[in-house]
């Protein structure tokens, strides 16, 4: 069993006897929960002591395959991005473990697809209930491994759990069709059937929600999954596996294979090219998405891709400045700017430009507080690693060298190497890196424009199109701009747009397919036409 550190000394408690640790085992004729003691407690370390009292059963370090916790031949370290301290050593899965996980998922699929929609719904609901019961501990795991402020981590856990709740309900609403044909002795049926095993590859910035948004839909449809979590944040995926086991999700239905950055490429390729895998779902960079699309093309697998963004945030002269500033803070600085729908380019009309920049700078200084995610009042945690900081630094230096002005921020924060000051730039032009490279950090560059047509042209001058935002009080303009923005999601006078009930996804090179909403489950279903003759 892979090892972790420190938790024994902080008095971690175990889950109560109502939900004892258990594993799952196959049985002839079906898949059932298996009894037996869970492995011993994992131990994590966080310099802020934020994991004291955490449920030890949630702190897993081995892979979860076929309902069993399995070690790997090697381990890799997971670090607290705030302090750089080691949180623990996690199983470093390779190609062999990846193929074993796919086989386990495929064997489980043969039985899981036959489980009634009502029963699948019930199991997903139990999983949701367990997430809610353990929400505080799950949030602290997120903060420990990603650096996200604890308040935001709590928000992510609720968001994550709501996907399980939503798809537990959608599981019972997978309807087909009856089509009356021209021939009197025939009837045509359209069935919806689960596609098979899904390979799920998730990012570090939402280590829980990006799993349940995919896995909830897959399991509701009758598919099984192999999850490869980001190497920076494997603990959240493994904690979800523990709760899935407790909920009674059968062996092999949900599998997790953590791996190091060194093994990530070969493990990703192994699960995406395996002939037993029918579906690939990925959230991450456009560059990596293209590689996975190439893997999928060789065997024509179904894909869902939620890739990079370069979200414009447009402020027209008619906008309410206070509302626009509030929306800008929310859309830019959530998770320290590390979300795919974060505003990356601020386009502000000349007549309101100076007032907006002044108010935005004041709001940033007043409301954004850099610190460790476990500390009360922190709104801006660390970036995930030093490479992310270097990217922000590079964009700031490039912009300044080309004539941009630093209004506030602009440099690394004194707290440590992974912290960067929330930064606002003005006098930004379109030849600067920050206007055509996704930042993924706390940098807000402001471009001044004159006309609506100019703003639309700048906003659409990108090969990606995930989200876009704009503020206006002109009803006619609202309709024009909303329809003309080349993005998959639009926020009108609103900076936070994600919801489990609404479809999430982009256009252009921002991806393929939609997640969440009533449309999300269709990504894991095949249509089958049945012609019934001789009537």
Swiss-Prot record:
Pathway: Amino-acid degradation; 4-aminobutanoate degradation. It is an enzyme of class 1 (oxidoreductase). Its EC number is 1.2.1.24. The record marks 205 as: Transition state stabilizer. It is found in: Mitochondrion. Redox-regulated. Inhibited under oxydizing conditions. CDD domains: ALDH_F5_SSADH_GabD (cd07103). Disulfide bonds join 340-342. NAD(+) binds at residues 213, 228-231, 284-289. The modification N6-acetyllysine is found at residues 126, 265, 365, 411. GO terms for molecular function: identical protein binding; succinate-semialdehyde dehydrogenase (NAD+) activity. The modification Phosphoserine is found at residue 499. Homotetramer. Catalyzes one step in the degradation of the inhibitory neurotransmitter gamma-aminobutyric acid (GABA). Belongs to the aldehyde dehydrogenase family. This is Succinate-semialdehyde dehydrogenase, mitochondrial. It comes from Hylobates lar.
């Amino acid at each position: 069993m892979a090892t972790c550190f420190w938790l024994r000394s902080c008095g971690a408690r175990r889950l109560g006897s109502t939900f004892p640790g258990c594993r799952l085992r196959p049985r002839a004729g079906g898949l059932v929960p298996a009894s037996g003691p869970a492995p011993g407690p994992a131990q994590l370390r966080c310099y802020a002591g934020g994991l004291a009292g955490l449920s030890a059963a949630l702190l897993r370090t081995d892979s979860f395959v076929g309902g069993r916790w399995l070690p790997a031949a090697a381990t890799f370290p997971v670090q607290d991005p705030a302090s750089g301290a080691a949180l623990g050593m996690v199983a470093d899965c390779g190609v062999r473990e990846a193929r074993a996980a796919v086989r386990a998922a495929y064997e489980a699929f043969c039985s899981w697809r036959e489980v009634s929609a009502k029963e699948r719904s019930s199991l997903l609901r139990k999983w949701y209930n367990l997430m809610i019961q353990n929400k505080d501990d799950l949030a602290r795991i997120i903060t420990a491994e990603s650096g996200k402020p604890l308040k935001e981590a709590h928000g992510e856990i609720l968001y994550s759990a709501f996907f399980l709740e939503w798809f537990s309900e959608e599981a019972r609403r997978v309807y087909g069709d009856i089509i009356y044909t021209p021939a009197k002795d025939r009837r045509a049926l359209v069935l919806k059937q689960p596609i098979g095993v899904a390979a799920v590859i998730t990012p570090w910035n939402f280590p829980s929600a990006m799993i349940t948004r995919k896995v909830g839909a897959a399991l509701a449809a009758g598919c099984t999954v192999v999850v490869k979590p980001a190497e920076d944040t494997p603990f959240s995926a493994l904690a979800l596996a523990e709760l899935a086991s407790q909920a009674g999700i059968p062996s092999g239905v949900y599998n997790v294979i953590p791996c190091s950055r060194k093994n990530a490429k070969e493990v990703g390729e192994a699960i995406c090219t395996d002939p037993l895998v029918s579906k690939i779902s990925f959230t991450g960079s456009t560059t990596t998405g293209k590689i996975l699309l190439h893997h999928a093309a060789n065997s024509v697998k179904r894909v869902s891709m939620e890739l990079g963004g370069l979200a414009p945030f447009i402020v027209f002269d008619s906008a309410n400045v206070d509302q626009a500033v509030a929306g800008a803070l929310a859309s830019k600085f959530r998770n320290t700017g590390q979300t795919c729908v974060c505003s990356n380019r601020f386009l502000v009309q000349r007549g309101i430009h100076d007032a907006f920049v002044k108010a935005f700078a004041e709001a940033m200084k007043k409301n954004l507080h850099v610190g460790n995610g476990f500390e009360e009042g922190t709104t801006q945690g660390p970036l995930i690693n030093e490479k992310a900081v270097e990217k922000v630094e590079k964009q700031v230096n490039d912009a300044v060298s080309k004539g941009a002005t630093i209004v506030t921020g602009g440099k690394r924060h004194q707290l440590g190497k992974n912290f960067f000051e929330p930064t606002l730039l003005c006098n930004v032009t379109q030849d600067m890196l920050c206007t055509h490279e996704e930042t993924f950090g706390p940098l807000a560059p402001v471009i001044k424009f004159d006309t609506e047509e100019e703003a639309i042209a700048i906003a659409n001058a990108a090969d990606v199109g995930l989200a876009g935002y704009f503020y206006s009080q002109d009803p006619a303009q609202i309709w024009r701009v909303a329809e003309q923005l080349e993005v998959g999601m639009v926020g009108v006078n609103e900076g936070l747009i994600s919801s489990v009930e609404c479809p999430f996804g982009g256009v252009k090179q921002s991806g393929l397919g939609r997640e969440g909403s009533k449309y999300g489950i269709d990504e894991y279903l095949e249509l089958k036409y049945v012609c019934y003759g001789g009537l």
